[in-house]
């Protein structure tokens, strides 16, 4: 398995993975978002490639804050449904942690939906613990 930067040629596979995560987007929208992230140096988008196929996707970014130390946040992590349990997710999270350490950050945080129990079990297995419960509030315009 290879963990590497997401390339434009990977966007069709990334679109499929995001759909598996529950985000039905068209490839043009994923491409536009990827291009915006490329311009943001505090963001990292990686893929896991296995036998020439993209089977995992990670987006992590550095989040500065006034009220707490700056930390890395995993915005998205998804492994192809056919490859879950094979170490792909752990490899991507290890990449996120190495990136955070290299930037001098002291922690990696992530948010996971309350109903995603298999994801909760995965994160606990790799050393993460629940640090709180919150509600997402949004106002669209």
Where is each model-derived feature located?
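Conserved GNAT acetyl-CoA-binding A-motif
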Residues: 93, 100-112
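Conserved acetyl-CoA-binding loop-helix of GNAT-fold acetyltransferases
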Residues: 79, 85-98, 121, 125
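Conserved acetyl-CoA-binding loop of GNAT-fold acetyltransferases
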Residues: 124-133
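Extreme N-terminal starter segment of soluble prokaryotic enzymes
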Residues: 1-3
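Acetyl-CoA-dependent GNAT
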Residues: 5-70, 75, 80, 93-95, ...
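Conserved beta-strand-loop-alpha-helix junction that forms the acyl-donor binding cleft
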Residues: 109-119, 138-140
């Amino acid at each position: 398995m290879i963990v590497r930067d997401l390339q434009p040629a990977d966007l069709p596979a990334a679109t499929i993975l995001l759909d598996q995560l529950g985000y039905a987007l068209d490839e043009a929208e994923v491409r536009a978002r990827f291009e915006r992230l490329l311009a943001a140096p505090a963001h990292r988008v990686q893929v896991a490639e296995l036998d020439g196929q993209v089977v995992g996707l990670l987006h992590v970014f550095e989040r500065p804050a006034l009220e707490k130390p700056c930390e890395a946040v995993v915005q998205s992590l998804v492994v192809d449904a056919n490859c879950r349990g094979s170490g792909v997710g752990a490899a991507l999270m290890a990449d996120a942690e190495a990136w955070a350490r290299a930037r001098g950050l002291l922690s990696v945080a992530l948010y996971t939906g309350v109903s995603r129990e298999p994801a909760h079990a995965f994160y606990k297995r790799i050393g993460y613990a629940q640090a709180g419960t919150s509600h997402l509030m949004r106002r669209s315009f």
